[in-house]
Structures are given as structure tokens and as C-alpha cells.
């Protein structure tokens, strides 16, 4: 439920949000919110609906029941896609383009003005010197870092991160936490799914636990 003591509406809120597949419930109904400067850590066993929840919020799946609000107003599917940056299990990269070409291509594709230059984003995620490397030549961990660079370039205030620590070593996990912290300090927010014990983004973090449907 939305806290009535909030002086401003949450950045994102869900009311009685639920989703079913083949008439079988996947999650919900759920009521939750996330404020600017806050991370919501979504936990649950495999099959609890963590990935599905993020895909519904991102507008990749239809809202079957319930309501999604942005800044206190009901959000249409197109509104959500502009407001949120989604990082899923698949990096969504062009294998035959270089790392730098991928970042330029994706920024142009979405009509977004990057908050930093793509080359700087590569350096931030530890891929300096890989500007001309083709994506198909990268390891799984390097591809995840490139996807993180794309996320960093997005001006979207809300990050939806599905298992962002997967395929990363301890250095990469620390990188993700630093990125989340910087995003929150800048007034953004994040929803992060994980089942890893090590995955604990810093700063303001609350928990949402999903139970697998019976």
C-alpha cells in the first residue's frame, strides 16, 4: 500500500498487481512501492515470478490485474517503457557490432540522450580498451558488463534489474553495487531480483519476497 505519510508519491507503486499464465497464478496480488533514492530487493525461489514481475513492470507483458502508478498516476504501457530501463537475463546485444557500436546503436534506437559518452561508460564498467572488440568475441561476464554500460547510459529514473549479479565475479558484483548506489544518490530507484546470498545492494534497501504459486 502507498504510505499516506509520504509528502510526495512514490516513484513507482503497484496496487493489487497479479499475473497468471495458462490460467495458473504466477504472482500476486501484490501491493508495493519504491521511492526515489531507494532499492527494492525482490527475492523468492525459482518459479516465484520474479522475472515475470519485472517484465510486467517494464511493459514487456500485459498487466492482467491491478494497477501500476508512476509518480502517483496510472501508467500506460508506453509510459513505463520510457520511464524504466530493463536489464534481463539476455543482454540484447548485436553480436557482430563492436562494444562501442552497440552503445551508439542502442542510444540512437531508443532516441535517448545519453547522460555520459559511451566511451566513458565502457571505462566505468571495466571495458576500457575493448572499444573495437566484437560482442561475439566477449566472455559472458564481459557481455554482462557491456549491458551494464548500456544501463548506465540510460536517463531512465527506474532501473529494473533481473539477476544483475549473474555471470559476474566479485569485482563485477562490487561494480553493480556501486552503480546502483550512484543511481540512487542521483535520485533514481531500482528493483533488483536475486536469490544470491551475496547480493545486497547498499544504501536504502527494502525487501519484497515472492512465494511460488501452489
From Swiss-Prot:
Oligomer status and interactors: The complex is composed of two ATP-binding proteins (CcmA) and two transmembrane proteins (CcmB).
GO biological processes: cytochrome complex assembly
Protein name in the entry: Cytochrome c biogenesis ATP-binding export protein CcmA
The entry's keywords: ATP-binding, Cell inner membrane, Cell membrane, Cytochrome c-type biogenesis, Membrane, Nucleotide-binding, Translocase, Transport
Every ABC transporter domain range: 12-214
EC number: 7.6.2.5
Molecular function GO labels: ABC-type heme transporter activity; ATP binding; ATP hydrolysis activity
Residues where ATP binds: 44-51
Name of the top EC class for this enzyme: translocase
Statement: the UniProt record of this protein carries the keyword Cell membrane: yes
Recorded topology in the membrane: Peripheral membrane protein
Family listed: Belongs to the ABC transporter superfamily. CcmA exporter (TC 3.A.1.107) family.
Compartment(s): Cell inner membrane
Gene3D superfamilies tied to this protein: P-loop containing nucleotide triphosphate hydrolases
Superkingdom field: Bacteria
Catalysed reactions listed for this entry: heme b(in) + ATP + H2O = heme b(out) + ADP + phosphate + H(+)
Gene this chain is encoded by: ccmA
Gene Ontology, cellular component aspect: plasma membrane
Primary location: membrane
Job description of the protein: Part of the ABC transporter complex CcmAB involved in the biogenesis of c-type cytochromes; once thought to export heme, this seems not to be the case, but its exact role is uncertain. Responsible for energy coupling to the transport system.
Amino acid at each position: 500500500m502507498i504510505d499516506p505519510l509520504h509528502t510526495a508519491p512514490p516513484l513507482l507503486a503497484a496496487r493489487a498487481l497479479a499475473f497468471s499464465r495458462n490460467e495458473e497464478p504466477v504472482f500476486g496480488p501484490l501491493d508495493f512501492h519504491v521511492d526515489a533514492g531507494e532499492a527494492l530487493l525482490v527475492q523468492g525461489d525459482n518459479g516465484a515470478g520474479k522475472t515475470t514481475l519485472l517484465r510486467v513492470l517494464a511493459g514487456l507483458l500485459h498487466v492482467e490485474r491491478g494497477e501500476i502508478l508512476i509518480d502517483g498516476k496510472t501508467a500506460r504501457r508506453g509510459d513505463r517503457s520510457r520511464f524504466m530501463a530493463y536489464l534481463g537475463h539476455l543482454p540484447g546485444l548485436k553480436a557482430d557490432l563492436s562494444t562501442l557500436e552497440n552503445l551508439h546503436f542502442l542510444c540512437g534506437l531508443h532516441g535517448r540522450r545519453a547522460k555520459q559518452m559511451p566511451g566513458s561508460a565502457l571505462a566505468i564498467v571495466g571495458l576500457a580498451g575493448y572499444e573495437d572488440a566484437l560482442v561475439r568475441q566477449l566472455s559472458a561476464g564481459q557481455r554482462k558488463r557491456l549491458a551494464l554500460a548500456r544501463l548506465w547510459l540510460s536517463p531512465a529514473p527506474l532501473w529494473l534489474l533481473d539477476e544483475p549479479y549473474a555471470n559476474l565475479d566479485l569485482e563485477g558484483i562490487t561494480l553493480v553495487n556501486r552503480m546502483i548506489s550512484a543511481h540512487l544518490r542521483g535520485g533514481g530507484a531500482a528493483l533488483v531480483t536475486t536469490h544470491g546470498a551475496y547480493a545486497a545492494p547498499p544504501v536504502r534497501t527494502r525487501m519484497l519476497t515472492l512465494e511460488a504459486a501452489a
